[in-house]
Amino acid sequence: MAKLLALSLSFCFLLLGGCFALREQPQQNECQLERLDALEPDNRIESEGGLIETWNPNNKQFRCAGVALSRATLQRNALRRPYYSNAPQEIFIQQGNGYFGMVFPGCPETFEEPQESEQGEGRRYRDRHQKVNRFREGDIIAVPTGIVFWMYNDQDTPVIAVSLTDIRSSNNQLDQMPRRFYLAGNHEQEFLQYQHQQGGKQEQENEGNNIFSGFKRDYLEDAFNVNRHIVDRLQGRNEDEEKGAIVKVKGGLSIISPPEKQARHQRGSRQEEDEDEEKQPRHQRGSRQEEEEDEDEERQPRHQRRRGEEEEEDKKERGGSQKGKSRRQGDNGLEETVCTAKLRLNIGPSSSPDIYNPEAGRIKTVTSLDLPVLRWLKLSAEHGSLHKNAMFVPHYNLNANSIIYALKGRARLQVVNCNGNTVFDGELEAGRALTVPQNYAVAAKSLSDRFSYVAFKTNDRAGIARLAGTSSVINNLPLDVVAATFNLQRNEARQLKSNNPFKFLVPARESENRASA
């Protein structure tokens, strides 16, 4: 038995450790994009407990980035049935609270019921399973390749989860098409129609079967040591297709979870956001310029002052991995293992921002330095919000493609390619997605009272270079180099370097505020 456990763990490490390899490169000319579009989902699959919407992964800009995008909505007491994918995923919780779980091969069942909780056929049965986690609005959840994942909404507010699948990951040994392997049901695969558009062949006569459907009944009877009736349910025989990938659970699920976490999450993220806004004035000291210049010094005290049992939990679970320090005295010094890896981190409005200007907005990022599991996935993310007429200065992603999904409001974005051509100059509004290829320059200005977005990035340590403002590329060039490069007088070059005192986020001009009032 010990050998089997060791073998399973070795397989799991091989499965996840391979992510250190580079992503596969796009085919020639795939990223020579002369035009970008803000895209809406173009496929919708209804289920008993919600719906799944998908964007076409064959679209040129998604093919350039090597990703697929989908959005799931779960109503109260809705369960997204367990499935696994051929590529790693980042899931952002746009709205709602609930539970999620993953199954890692070889890891122990660390959650169990008390002995008196259930009885059957004269003997006590105690349910045991791997860890179940809570999620809340603003969370990023990392799902490795081939790992079974499920989620459940136990609240009245619908859960909206936006998922990016990195189909160009080196861990995807199939074709460049996202695939979901469901453990139950007989519903339609959400990306199946795009596979047909690409010229793929039908893999089965019935394209809605689950992973058990193709096995003979007697194989499954022997494998599970159960009767044929249970096997028929396992294979989804005679099940209504309308149930779909998201099913309603009558009476709700009974989930083993620490009671203090349940109470904390039942308060919901809205209360946390209200508390966050009440504390905001504490940090609005000094001029707007000082706010940005002192962001590094203020970040740690602000983080410590945040109420946030969730923030404290995140900090404890993340431990010293960000700074290479041990989580606590007496720690054995080992790297966090697959079985105990932290799988989520909150980057939403209730989290402590990395970049903050009270008159312009805020930005929060998560990389593998914050959430080490992202090192396996080779992905990271960014959440930001802009006040009306505030601008995110022109910048570019050093080492990643960026898929920007608008959460709320609308903004005008401009994107420029290597030839100096504008490939996008338009509005990005809530529910739409825009791909910004690596090194393409982009700037954004909010057209709403508050524009918020999440950006998925195809590198676990994605970085940006700013083209304007303090500490930007232009600002860090010698004055004479700037003057000679742009054919400017020295005083003009000095203005170009120093007139914008802000690093990232530029507040609206007073004239713009008056015009919008």
Swiss-Prot record:
Residues 1-21 form the signal peptide. The keyword Disulfide bond applies. SMART domains: Cupin_1 (SM00835). Residues 36-232, 345-494 form the Cupin type-1 domain. Residues 249-335 are annotated as: Disordered. GO terms for molecular function: nutrient reservoir activity. Coiled coil: none annotated. Pfam families: Cupin_1. The keyword Disulfide bond applies. InterPro entries: 11S_seedstore_CS (IPR022379), 11S_seedstore_pln (IPR006044), Cupin_1 (IPR006045), RmlC-like_jellyroll (IPR014710), RmlC_Cupin_sf (IPR011051), Seed_Storage-Functional (IPR050253). Keywords: Disulfide bond, Seed storage protein, Signal, Storage protein. Disulfide bonds join 31-64, 107-339. PANTHER family: GLYCININ G3, OS03G0336100 PROTEIN-RELATED. Belongs to the 11S seed storage protein (globulins) family. This protein found in the seeds of many leguminous and non-leguminous plants is the source of sulfur-containing amino acids in seed meals. Hexamer; each subunit is composed of an acidic and a basic chain derived from a single precursor and linked by a disulfide bond. This is Legumin A. It comes from Pisum sativum. The lineage of its organism: Eukaryota, Viridiplantae, Streptophyta, Embryophyta, Tracheophyta. The gene is LEGA.
